[in-house]
Amino acid sequence: MQIHKLCFLALFLANAAFAVKFNFDSFDGSNLLFLGDAELGPSSDGVSRSGALSMTRDETPFSHGQGLYINPIQFKSSNTSSPFDFKTSFTFSITPRTKPNSGQGLAFVIVPAADNSGASGGGYLGILNKTNDGKSENNLIFIEFDTFKNNESNDISGNHVGININSMTSLVAEKAGYWVQTLVGKRKVWSFKDVNLSSGERFKAWIEFRSKDSRNTITIAPENVKKPKRPLIQGSRVLNDVLLQNMYAGFAGSMGRAGERHDVWSWSFEN
């Protein structure tokens, strides 16, 4: 029994030694890597900065970029072990500059390297390209907040949230929205509230992974709404074959021919 306790303590201390925890209420450029067109978002005056992390630039068709935490994060004790638990939350907004909306969307990403040279704009969200889309050696996972229906990716709509592994085709996707529970008589009833991701409104997202049962949950709601008790997406997917020992976490986004802003306003992460 004593040996088991010592082994558990050693494992706990090893995991704790590599734990990462941060909370950005806004962004000033420190602790971030800017790839492609990602930048500190401009304010309406065009001179000062808004405090947001922006993935795209209005004046550049098919603009795309990635904004990553400056240091790699340890997601596993080794490349062959099970991943650690992790959770992240952030507020974001997607604001089209033209009508109809030209897309494309924003994503939370976990990628193997701080390098987006193999990424394209448009429907590839600044993450993949036509050649590497779907390849298992990509070793990446992302949660997409998609604002344009791309038939080649089998998108369910132009306003959805999806879990993607190595591919622009989502493993699971749901229309954007959140669940609320109300009392009808003596019964508690769930009802679904639609949201428009490209309304320019700020939304908050919560993404959680629990290693012991490989449970993934994604929840979204308007910024001023308390975290819903029922996730938008929940399910199990073993990530041992996807996550490497050390990877980068952050955001990616892209637009089509016309302007669309993809801004992240705050971000917290913990593993």
Swiss-Prot record:
What does induction of this protein depend on? By oligogalacturonides and the diterpenoid compound sclareol. Accumulates in response to mechanical wounding, chitin, methyl jasmonate (MeJA) and ethylene (ET) stimuli.
Q: Key word Signal present in the record?
A: yes
Which superkingdom heads the taxonomic lineage of this protein's source?
A: Eukaryota
Keywords, A to Z? Answer: Apoplast, Ethylene signaling pathway, Glycoprotein, Jasmonic acid signaling pathway, Lectin, Plant defense, Secreted, Signal
Kindly list the biological process annotations in GO that this record carries: cellular response to chitin; cellular response to ethylene stimulus; cellular response to jasmonic acid stimulus; defense response to fungus; ethylene-activated signaling pathway; response to wounding
The subcellular location is: Secreted, Extracellular space, Apoplast
Q: Which GO terms describe its cellular component?
A: apoplast; cytosol
**Segments of this protein annotated with the region Legume-lectin like:** 20-270
| Residues carrying covalently attached carbohydrate according to the record | 79, 129, 151, 196
Q: Quote the InterPro entries the UniProt record gives.
A: ConA-like_dom_sf, L-lectin, Legume_lectin_dom, Leguminous_Lectin
Q: Tell me the protein family, please.
A: Belongs to the leguminous lectin family.
By what name is this protein known?
Lectin-like protein LEC
Q: Which organism is it from?
A: Arabidopsis thaliana (Mouse-ear cress)
This protein's encoding gene:
LEC
